[in-house]
């Protein structure tokens, strides 16, 4: 990251993985309650912010099918400006790397990076908990990225506890299909009654078991997505004799964990050419974690 008085450049908006995802119920308002462990990665979109004196908030990058007014970075900046009454404006540029509709939290992470970066650039000095409350207005995953640590999440994803996870390298494979999260959550076949866990149920498994992630929990959305999207099923089948693999979030991305970058890259080299893939290392905290207290 490069910081000047009027700009913040090369701000990573890290991807996340759901190491498991259990859906434990559905609230009267239609939102689902869940339990998951979020893992940060050192791979994601890169954002650039330049302060404006005229108070305008603009996105300088064209993104197909995402008009600026619907972009979570613009919405996050607008929400923060309205909440604080700040006279400042900003130009936002996005180097897009994460595929959309992939279960990697790309839009949510961009929103959180915007909140954290502007908290610094606009000299707002809002505490982290206040930013997390704003983040929840933008989406269920956004508070996690503002929280900024690998976490056990509950509720709709806003109740967060830090978890210590081992260093890993992940191979993330994304077939060329977009999976709409809302549509999967509305599927009648979706399991909504997983038995709730406590935080003490899983850390030793996640840290020590060499067969992880297959050895602990599951992704309750995976079976539904596999039944609707043959491309996701194909990726999971490919991994069956290679390494334990699991879908992240509502898909379409599938991931496998490895002890070293070399192991992950050796498997990546064997993938079919038509699949997007990346090898990424685990992160312990968000790169902009210190921009809130």
UniProtKB/Swiss-Prot annotation:
Gene3D superfamilies: 3.30.230.10, GHMP kinase, C-terminal domain. Keywords: ATP-binding, Isoprene biosynthesis, Kinase, Nucleotide-binding, Transferase. Coiled coil: none annotated. ATP binds at residues 99-109. Its EC number is 2.7.1.148. The active site is at residues 16, 141. Catalyzes the phosphorylation of the position 2 hydroxy group of 4-diphosphocytidyl-2C-methyl-D-erythritol. It comes from the Bacteria. Pfam families: GHMP_kinases_C, GHMP_kinases_N. This is 4-diphosphocytidyl-2-C-methyl-D-erythritol kinase. InterPro entries: GHMP_kinase_C_dom, GHMP_kinase_C_sf, GHMP_kinase_N_dom, IspE, Ribosomal_Su5_D2-typ_SF, Ribsml_uS5_D2-typ_fold_subgr. The keyword ATP-binding applies. It catalyses: 4-CDP-2-C-methyl-D-erythritol + ATP = 4-CDP-2-C-methyl-D-erythritol 2-phosphate + ADP + H(+). SUPFAM superfamilies: GHMP Kinase, C-terminal domain, Ribosomal protein S5 domain 2-like. Pathway: Isoprenoid biosynthesis; isopentenyl diphosphate biosynthesis via DXP pathway; isopentenyl diphosphate from 1-deoxy-D-xylulose 5-phosphate: step 3/6. Belongs to the GHMP kinase family. IspE subfamily. GO terms for biological process: isopentenyl diphosphate biosynthetic process, methylerythritol 4-phosphate pathway; terpenoid biosynthetic process. One of its GO terms (molecular function) is ATP binding.
């Amino acid at each position: 990251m490069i910081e000047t008085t009027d700009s913040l450049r090369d701000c990573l908006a890290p991807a996340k993985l759901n190491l498991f995802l259990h859906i434990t119920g559905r609230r009267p308002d239609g939102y689902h309650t869940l339990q998951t462990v979020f893992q940060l990665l050192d791979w994601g979109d890169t954002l650039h912010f330049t302060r404006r004196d005229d108070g305008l908030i603009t996105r300088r990058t064209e993104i197909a099918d995402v008009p600026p007014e619907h972009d979570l970075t613009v919405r996050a900046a607008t929400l923060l400006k309205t909440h604080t009454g700040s006279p400042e404006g900003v130009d936002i540029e996005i180097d897009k790397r994460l595929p959309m509709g992939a279960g990697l939290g790309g839009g949510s992470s961009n929103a959180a990076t915007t909140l954290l970066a502007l908290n610094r650039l606009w000299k707002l000095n809002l505490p982290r908990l206040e930013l997390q409350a704003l983040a929840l207005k933008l989406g269920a995953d956004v508070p996690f990225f503002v929280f900024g640590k690998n976490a056990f999440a509950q509720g709709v994803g806003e109740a967060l506890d830090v978890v210590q996870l081992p260093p890993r390298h992940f191979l993330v494979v994304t077939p060329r299909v977009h999976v709409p999260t809302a549509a999967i959550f509305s599927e009648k076949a979706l399991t909504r009654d997983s038995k709730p866990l406590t935080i003490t149920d899983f850390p030793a498994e996640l840290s020590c078991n060499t067969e992880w992630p297959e050895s602990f929990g599951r992704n309750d959305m995976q079976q539904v997505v596999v039944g609707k999207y043959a491309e996701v099923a194909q990726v999971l089948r490919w991994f069956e004799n290679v390494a334990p693999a699991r879908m992240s979030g509502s898909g379409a991305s599938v991931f496998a964990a490895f002890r070293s970058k070399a192991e992950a890259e050796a498997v990546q080299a064997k993938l079919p050419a038509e699949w997007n893939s990346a090898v990424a290392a685990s992160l312990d905290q968000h790169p902009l974690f210190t921009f809130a207290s």
